[in-house]
Amino acid sequence: MEAAVLCKGFLFDLDGTLVDSLPVVERSWRCWAKSYGVDPDAVLDFIHGKQAITTLRHFMPDKSEAEIQAEFLRLEHIEATDLDGIRALPGAIELLEHLEANAIPWAIVTSGSIPVAHARHRAAGLPTPEVFVTAEQVKHGKPQPDAYLLGAELLGLPPQMCLVVEDAQAGIQAGIAAGCLVAAVNVPAETPELLEVDFVLSTLDALRVEKLPDNQVNVTQNA
């Protein structure tokens, strides 16, 4: 059995979808959690797919916004400069190069800030999109739909004609809320939202993408 959808563009999450940044994320946040006396595992369970500032506000409820912002800037610098182990995930470069070669619109839509996202993007050697949505551009981060709605708007496409590619539950929720098609990559099988997505993938190279004469894109996956 083969899954198939028609779309006109792609909206990719970055961390965990296109780029393996898990070693950096775990190092940074475990160090932060220990310095604040917070359970590191609780922090790592919370952060996936969310903006860093959201995590800090959650775990620093007794701190002022000024203190939280100062801590965010310190953590941002650590994450933007620690690039050891950053690499493109299997199939990511090949898929993006295929989209580029066929003039298929695509964007990166990340919960990361500009310094962190751009540093990891460069370190992984990914092609550069014309549209790169970061945390600074939206009022509400994932799981709210704002980032994916903005990504679709900047591509000049209706959300329902965009395929969101995500690895995080918060991002999948954001894509669904935006009204987009959704492909879930390397997501735990018990994630409830998998019942609502269009594709469930182990890696990106499971997708086949074909541009049609009418500029629609046929996306398939062998089961």
PLM region spans:
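N-terminal start-of-chain detector that recognizes signal peptides
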Residues: 27-29, 78-80, 104-107, 135-137, ...
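A generic structural signal for short
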Residues: 17-18, 83-84, 105-106, 136-137, ...
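Asp-based, Mg2+/Mn2+-dependent phosphohydrolase catalytic module
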Residues: 1-8, 97-100, 113-223
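Ser/Thr-glycine-rich phosphate-binding loops at phosphate-binding pockets of nucleotides
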Residues: 17, 21, 110, 171
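Conserved SAM-binding loop
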Residues: 18, 45, 88, 106-109, ...
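N-terminal helical cap/lid subdomain that shapes the substrate entry/recognition surface
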Residues: 3-102, 115-118, 126
